[in-house]
């Protein structure tokens, strides 16, 4: 969903930066007993899109920047993509075994592939429209991927690739469910799309908060209503995750009322056919990103948002405060005991014990 203007580009600059390493010990009760926070690097940067690629944490950022942090070598590398005098903001990132893909949010939308081998950058998709605003991107496999954007007509803007990201095609509106007036998506943490096998879930916000489901990699769709708060421009589902094909969790709330903890989180046990509110007036208010803990049997969830980092060990009913730092926008797990969080001016490693 549009919140600021963007600028676009292409010129590559390789940079390395000094690593910062600050540690904080936070004791708490639950499935884990303690957590340490290691600051991997700090910079003047806004990061809402990250992914884990073996020993590297790749990121897309503001001011035409992307890069990675090598967890083994403890080194950061960063590049810029410039086009004319404009800049890009990358809020969507995805990968295949060979390439990283970065998608900018606003007009014109530019999608780049970046070779993991030599970091060569290639423009693979461009869309010009005053209403264009892309929110999230994922791959089903090494050949097929999908990205979702706000409606430019009366449906979500959905582009797909079937050739490993070499070419992308926008799905025709008559093949997609119609969005309600004022229904769009939020580019908060690259978690508007969740994929498990061939199953795909997209989440919406604004005047409506719904889940769009495809069982066949975006060929057909069904839409499900949810009880998440909705009705205003900045309400709805901001983030989603599925533990498996049946257990899922959605969260969000009201961005303008970030302390409101009601009607902002819900779960499913049937693959998204039905959703039930949970944790009413408990835990967090506005949620930017939620992720299931690997190996937690769908019971353990971590959230980053307006009240910091919080953890649930009972499926979202109760929440424990892990950190009061509110500057994180997104989080991904490396394994059960390690996660990476990023946001305003920093990237950190969370070590759960």
Each language-model region and where it sits:
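Bacterial Sec-dependent N-terminal signal peptides
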Residues: 1-32
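Asp-box/BNR beta-propeller loop motif
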Residues: 27-40, 63-83, 108-128, 158-177, ...
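Entry beta-strands of beta-propeller and related beta-repeat scaffolds
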Residues: 56-58, 99-101, 143-147, 199-201, ...
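Short, solvent-exposed loop/turn segments at conserved positions within beta-propeller repeat blades
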Residues: 106-108, 151-155, 205-207, 257-261
């Amino acid at each position: 969903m549009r919140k600021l203007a963007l600028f676009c580009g292409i010129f590559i600059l390789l940079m390395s930066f000094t690593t910062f390493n600050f540690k904080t010990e936070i004791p708490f009760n639950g499935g884990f007993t303690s957590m340490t926070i290691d600051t991997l690097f700090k910079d003047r940067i806004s990061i809402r899109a990250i992914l884990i690629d073996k020993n590297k944490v790749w990121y897309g950022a503001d001011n035409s920047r992307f890069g990675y942090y090598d967890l083994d070598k403890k080194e950061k590398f960063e590049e810029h993509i410039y086009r004319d005098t404009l800049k890009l903001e990358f809020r969507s990132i995805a990968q295949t075994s060979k390439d990283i893909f970065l998608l900018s949010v606003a007009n014109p939308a530019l999608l780049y592939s970046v070779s993991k081998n030599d970091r060569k950058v290639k423009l693979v998709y461009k869309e010009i429209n005053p209403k264009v605003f892309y929110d999230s991107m994922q791959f089903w496999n090494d050949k097929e991927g999908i990205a979702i954007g706000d409606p430019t007509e009366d449906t979500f803007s959905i582009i797909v690739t079937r050739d490993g990201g070499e070419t992308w095609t926008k799905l025709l509106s008559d093949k997609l469910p119609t969005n309600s007036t004022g229904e769009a998506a939020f580019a908060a943490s690259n978690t508007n799309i969740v994929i498990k096998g061939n199953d795909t879930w997209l989440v919406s916000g604004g005047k409506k908060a719904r889940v769009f489901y495809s069982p066949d990699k975006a060929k057909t769709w069904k839409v499900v209503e949810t009880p998440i708060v909705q009705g205003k421009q900045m309400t709805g589902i901001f983030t989603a995750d599925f533990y498996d094909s049946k257990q899922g969790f959605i969260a969000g709330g009201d961005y303008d009322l970030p302390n409101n903890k009601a009607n902002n989180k819900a779960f499913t046990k049937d693959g998204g056919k039905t959703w039930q509110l949970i944790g009413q007036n408990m835990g967090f208010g506005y949620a930017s990103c939620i992720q299931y803990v690997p190996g937690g049997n769908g019971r353990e969830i971590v959230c980053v948002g307006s009240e910091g980092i919080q953890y649930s060990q009972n499926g979202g009913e109760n929440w424990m405060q892990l950190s009061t730092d509110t500057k994180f926008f997104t989080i991904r797990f490396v394994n059960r005991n390690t996660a990476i969080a990023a946001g305003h001016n920093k990237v950190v490693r969370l070590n759960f014990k």
